[in-house]
Amino acid sequence: MRLSPFIILTALLLWPSDAGSAEQLVAAKIIVFKSERRMELLDVKSKILKAYEVSLGGNPEGPKSQQGDSRTPEGIYKISSRNPGSSYHLSLRISYPNRQDIAEAEALGVAPGGDIFIHGLTNGRGFLGFQHLLYDWTDGCIAVTNQEI
């Protein structure tokens, strides 16, 4: 089986889930291995700082090609912003779609979609914890527990 990693390049500080937590990691890269449902935070020397199990979009096989396909994108992206008004705990927007994604969608005559994030659980549902890993439930985002984000 071909591994299709989803790679995010970032230099942002990944903040703890509560202000009182002392643990903070500075990651140079985040790699998501879709087929393994695994996300790794790497330092500038590509050493793994931390690894997480993740849930993906409800239709995770293959690259995202259009809006509404419930797929998680594959490619190189950046963390473009934090979304303080999100319905999900501490969401980080990624820079999907990039130029290549837009060109591929235009060639197919479809909208590429957007609003892809790395986030915790739905607000008010943090109690679910690792139970969210039982199935892929996002619309294309990458989900971890609230404690992990």
Residue spans for each PLM region:
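Exported/periplasmic cell-wall-interacting domains
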Residues: E23-L25, S81-I149
